[in-house]
């Protein structure tokens, strides 16, 4: 447990009545500065908190260690989730660690093979349900009631408890100086909810002198929360057919939208809806600086640039962007298409090929 960046903050987590937490050494991930990406985005400073450095490659591990520990405390034997990939990988690993069985419901044809491979490797039962995350989640709720499954999606409050430690780490790594803005991608909005919970608790403890603004960036084709926030309406209108290649945020009915809205109200927050081209450009920019991430993560940085260009973020802003998933989570995205192709000319010699590449041909 001492190797866990989450359980270092055990005094701020629920009491597990003597149950040994289920941990894989999650947390404690790096937060490098990204000066070239900051210049590209138009802000004075940009650091990236890379939660893809967690054991299964995403931020989900921060919450899953707590949720699976609670399942053990309750004596549950089977855990389940609906997932576009990252939740399933994390749940399967932590369930395996705890000796529990796990069931994953996924939308048909909508999940990265790399993410499915993780869940399969860890021994989960994979079931297809519908064509969107929201279809799979609705089916999960029915099956959970019928079969007594312990659900570990972000509607589970224990997930939020673990994920709030991300903001604790961010502030700790900054010597408890709050940034002007924390940017993150928005899918089911559990992460935004968790950040808000962490900020409220830190402020109540007197550890936070001011609230950073929270920016939630969604893909334009899956942006119901952005539309609600921008329109000022009281209720979220679901997107029945969400579309984006950033599969981790391809969600049309985010379960945590009410909590996320309260977070934006608390922090004078912002939202952005970024195009596929903007996501791809941000991902390339990060990669050129040696920082790899999955497409959904890049949406956070794309949102910073978009709002800076619109004048909604000042040039002098000090920004932390949360990268939620590892580069290897969605290698199909890289291989299939967002980069200019440079097919080798089989008739040219190696020197000519190299010279042409160096010239950017």
Spans of features found by a protein language model:
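PLP-dependent amino-acid enzyme catalytic core
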Residues: 1-361
